[in-house]
Structures are given as structure tokens and as C-alpha cells.
Swiss-Prot record:
It catalyses: chorismate + L-glutamine = anthranilate + pyruvate + L-glutamate + H(+). Its EC number is 4.1.3.27. The gene is trpE2. One of its GO terms (biological process) is L-tryptophan biosynthetic process. Binds 1 Mg(2+) ion per subunit. This is Anthranilate synthase component 1 2. PANTHER family: AMINOBENZOATE/ANTHRANILATE SYNTHASE, ANTHRANILATE SYNTHASE COMPONENT 1. Component I catalyzes the formation of anthranilate using ammonia rather than glutamine, whereas component II provides glutamine amidotransferase activity. It comes from the Archaea. It comes from Haloarcula marismortui (strain ATCC 43049 / DSM 3752 / JCM 8966 / VKM B-1809).
Length: 536
């Protein structure tokens, strides 16, 4: 096994008067799909000792399509879809809940490097990224993950970031405000070059034997290549439903009416009110993800297995992206169903674009995104290069715009994340008052829904999806709790019944994925053996 730089070059790069991240990589001689690799490296289909914190990030890129049976295709020469990433062995995990933060180091060499700040949740995440020099990072023409912090930011972080200022306390929640792993070894799939690489970004400290560390990386690359060689086709499990709980329809429609009253009184222009469906039973998260990817391929596909919590998602919407000094936000607002034929599909899209309510709401949220980006951008650099495009997904069509700016010299990716969080399309306008009303009207804390899943890269880049079209799976010991959530933007002329139907449409993709695997044995060994009865 050889890495892309020699031992001597690695040692030379590691010479510095401060800790250094030396980037190196090994191309693996394997023929394996990302989900199959994830299953093997997390101990699902191998004897690997699995870490409790793992991730799979994939994408199916946006394409213009009027085909109601397939709005997306794996066009791999665009921004999102070229790469897939598997993280399997992090150095540490950072968990932030309210005013409390915790770092668990899995490698003693990182125990005093990964810290928290004691400020707000974004300050804690910035502090958790070790202060290092970077060596041997290649120039890339596109954004990609080279190691760093990977995880999720719950919507409920708004209490720490914004709502403390107006006297609202964080409610008790089953979820942390943020949970991120520090990853220094990432399996990268390049779907254009058709290669699989193991990318290393270890922190090498002063006085450390860099040559010995290089030898560890070579051994790890050999181990991973062996694990990923000659794997059998992946067999995933299914879903057994025991119970389902959904909030009463009239309760949601009453909340919509109350939100409309706030709009009419001038408190807000728009507010996003969401509702949940909770399903109980047993589910295989890998089977769930596999089905969701088939049913609803999207720009952001993610499977985060973080201890007893799994987040499975197919999000269409960028919260914020920073590549170099280029900041991007992609507000999506405006929804209609897919048609049963190309003609009906186009008709529905045309009606959506002609709807004055949809256009006004979308324009307002684009203005909100411009204001968010402007907070971290150089003066005069904010642009809207794409306005009111129609994007087609498996169950719905959306109106999307793109807002860009040039990152100011005194700002970084963490500042950009704070400035744009939460997305206006998941809160409302003006944001603070809309979030106060959400706190009043929604039945329970949102958790990851409406927050973000993504990463802060070593080199200062970031890419976050808004957590929508997603589900959380909580392992409660004797059963799993699966939570699906969706919201609708409420304005002065909103119809409560129509807004309820919109939330149902937005949940359809995730619920259809569960239905696709329902009845299949949850236990993979049983399924492979052909047993009909499910045991856990």
C-alpha cells in the first residue's frame, strides 16, 4: 500500500512550531458502493469493531425534468453529486445541549486539542476544531469533505443563539443542540473518476514521531482495503410497525389560524408551523436509508449513526455553503404536487409559479436570505443569480432561488452558519418573532428538524443541508421511535386545510420509504435466511 506522499515528505510537512494537519490519501483497489462500504466499516457486515458515531453523506444532483417518475438522476459532474463520503472512526465527539458542552475523545492524542468555548453553540463548535496549520491540501475546483467536524445542529439551538435575548428558555428535549464528530479518516468515492480513496487528515503535534504516524496511516489503509474487498451484496433489513401517533388535524389547523392572526396583526409576515408523525416498532436504518434514496433521491442524502440516534434524510435545500470566500444559500419556498403525466406536471408547476401567494412568499424569503448572507459578506457582493426555478422531486415540486455573496475577510464558515441559522424557510419573517410564535404554537421541541446536517472542513469550507424530508430513529431499547416532521409557511391568506395537506405531501417521501420496507424482516440474518417472523 502506498500513500500519495512518501514518508519523507510527510515528515517534512509535519515540521512546524504548532500542531499540523498533514493531508494524505491512498487509492483503494476495491469495487464497492458507498452504502455497502458504510455497512462493512461500521461492523454491520464485517467483524470490524464499530464506533458509535459514523456517517454516510451522498447526493443525487438537481436536474431539470418533467418526468413524474424520476425528477433526479445521478448527474455526477455537478457540485453535490460527484463525491460520497463515509466516516467510520472519529477522533472525538462534541455534544452541546443548552449551556452544557461535552467532549469525548476516542484518541488520547486529541484529548486536549478538542475543546469547547463556553460561549454559544457555534462558539463551542469553532473551539472544537483544533487550531492547526494545514499542509498538502490540494486545490480543488469544487467543494468536498477533507476531514473536520461532521454532524448536526438541531433547530432548538435557536434558544441559545437567538431566543435567550427575548427571555425564552430552552425547553427540555430528547436531542442535543449540536453533535459533531472530529473525523480524520474519510472514505471518499469520486463518481466521475470512478475511484475510492481513504483520505487522512491527522493532527501531528510538535515532538511527535511523524514517521511512526505515517506508518499507522499505511496500516490503516491496508486494513480498510482488506475490509472492503470481496464483499457480498448488501442485504438490508425492513420495518415492523407497532404503533403510530400523529397530532390531531384540527389542532394543527387551529395553530395555522392562530399564526394567521399574528400575520394580520403585523407581528410577522410569514411563519412556518410544523407537525409530527411518530411511528413505533423496529426498523433497520440502513434499509430505511436505502429505500429513501430510491424513493426520493435529493441533493443531500445523509445517514448519521450517532450513538442511540440515527438521522436518515433526503434534503433538497442548502442551509449554507462556503467554498473559499464564496457563500451560498438556496431558499426553497413554494410547493405543489407532482403530476401523473408530463403534461399535468408542467401544468401544476405553471399554476404554482402564477400563484400570487406563492410568489410573494418566495420573494420575501429570498430577501430574508439576502439579509442573512449580507451579515457575513463583503459590502455590495450579495447577488441572486438564480430566481424562482422549479425543482422536481419524487412527490412534490418546489420553487428555489440561489443567493450568493463573497465572505468578508473577518468572517469564517462558523460566522456564516450562525448568520443563516435557522433558515428563514423553516422559521419565518421576521425571524426572531416568528421563532417566538413557533415556540408558542408547536406541541414539542423540533429537535433536528429544521436544523442542519453537514460539516466544517479543515480548510474553512462548510456545507449544510436543512433537515427536512428526513426522519430521526431513536433506539429506545425494546423498540425504535421514528419521528417524521414537516411544516408549511403561513401567510395572511393561508387556508388551514391546504396547509395541512402540504405537510402530508412533504412527509410522503419518507413515509413511502418506510412502506417500501414494511413487512420485511428487520434482522438481516433472518431476512437472508428467508424467515417470515421478525425477532430483534
Amino acid at each position: 500500500m502506498t500513500l500519495d506522499i512518501s514518508r519523507e515528505e510527510f515528515v517534512e510537512h509535519a515540521k512546524a512550531d504548532r500542531p499540523v494537519v498533514v493531508r494524505t490519501a491512498a487509492e483503494l483497489d476495491v469495487d464497492v458502493e458507498p452504502l455497502t462500504a458504510y455497512a462493512a466499516l461500521t461492523g454491520r457486515t464485517s467483524d470490524v469493531a464499530a464506533n458509535d458515531y459514523t456517517f454516510l453523506l451522498e447526493s443525487a444532483e438537481k436536474v431539470a425534468s418533467s418526468d413524474p417518475d424520476g425528477a433526479f438522476a445521478p448527474e455526477t459532474d455537478d457540485r453535490h453529486a460527484r463525491f460520497s463520503f463515509v466516516g467510520y472512526d472519529p477522533r472525538a465527539v462534541v455534544t452541546v445541549t443548552g449551556d452544557e458542552s461535552e467532549v469525548e475523545a476516542f484518541d488520547d492524542r486529541y484529548a486536549d486539542l478538542v475543546t469547547t468555548d463556553g460561549g454559544d453553540v457555534v462558539d463551542d463548535l469553532r473551539a472544537a476544531m483544533p487550531d492547526v496549520a494545514l499542509r498538502n491540501f490540494p486545490a480543488m475546483d469544487r467543494q468536498h469533505l477533507e476531514g473536520g467536524l461532521v454532524g448536526f445542529l438541531s433547530y432548538d439551538a435557536v434558544y441559545d443563539l437567538w431566543l435567550d435575548e427575548v427571555g425564552l428558555d430552552r425547553p427540555d428535549s430528547r436531542f442535543p443542540d449540536a453533535q459533531f464528530v472530529l473525523t480524520t479518516s474519510t472514505v471518499r468515492f469520486d463518481h466521475v473518476e470512478d475511484t475510492v480513496s481513504l483520505v487522512f487528515t491527522p493532527v501531528v503535534r510538535q515532538g511527535e514521531d511523524a514517521g511512526e504516524r505515517y506508518g499507522e496511516l499505511v496500516a490503516e489503509a491496508e486494513r480498510v482495503e482488506a475490509v472492503l474487498s470481496d464483499l457480498s451484496p448488501l442485504s438490508t433489513g425492513g420495518f415492523r410497525r407497532e404503533d403510530e401517533v400523529a397530532g390531531p388535524r384540527d389542532e394543527y389547523e387551529d395553530a395555522v389560524e392562530r399564526a394567521k392572526e399574528y400575520v394580520l396583526s403585523g407581528d410577522i409576515y410569514q411563519g412556518v408551523i410544523s407537525r409530527t408523525r411518530e411511528l413505533y416498532g423496529d426498523v433497520d436504518p440502513l434499509g430505511f436509508y436505502e429505500a429513501l434514496r430510491a424513493v426520493n433521491p435529493s441533493p443531500y442524502m445523509y445517514l448519521l449513526g450517532y450513538d442511540d440516534l440515527t438521522i436518515v434524510g433526503a434534503s433538497p435545500e442548502t442551509l449554507v455553503s462556503v467554498a473559499g470566500d464564496h457563500v451560498v444559500s438556496n431558499p426553497i419556498a413554494g410547493t405543489c404536487p407532482r403530476g401523473n403525466s408530463p403534461v399535468e406536471d408542467r401544468r401544476l408547476a405553471g399554476e404554482m409559479l402564477a400563484d400570487g401567494k406563492e410568489r410573494a412568499e418566495h420573494t420575501m424569503l429570498v430577501d430574508l436570505a439576502r439579509n442573512d448572507v449580507r451579515r457575513v459578506a463583503e459590502a455590495g457582493s450579495v447577488r441572486v443569480p438564480e430566481f424562482m426555478n422549479v425543482l422536481k422531486y419524487s412527490h412534490v415540486q418546489h420553487i428555489e432561488s440561489t443567493v450568493t455573496g463573497r465572505l468578508a475577510e473577518d468572517k469564517d464558515a462558523f460566522d456564516a452558519a450562525r448568520a443563516t441559522f435557522p433558515a428563514g424557510t423553516l422559521s419565518g419573517a421576521p425571524k426572531i418573532r416568528a421563532m417566538e410564535i413557533i415556540d408558542e404554537l408547536e406541541r414539542s421541541p423540533r429537535g433536528p428538524y429544521g436544523g442542519g446536517v453537514g460539516y466544517f472542513d479543515w480548510d474553512g469550507d462548510t456545507d449544510f443541508a436543512i433537515v427536512i424530508r428526513s426522519a430521526t430513529v431513536e433506539d429506545e431499547g425494546d423498540r425504535d421511535r421514528i419521528t417524521v416532521q414537516a411544516g408549511a409557511g403561513i401567510v395572511a391568506d393561508s387556508d388551514p386545510e391546504s396547509e395541512y395537506v402540504e405537510t402530508e405531501q412533504k412527509m410522503d417521501g419518507v413515509l413511502t420509504a418506510l412502506e417500501e420496507i414494511e413487512g420485511e424482516p428487520v434482522d438481516v440474518a433472518e431476512r437472508a435466511a428467508g424467515h417470515e417472523e421478525v425477532t430483534r
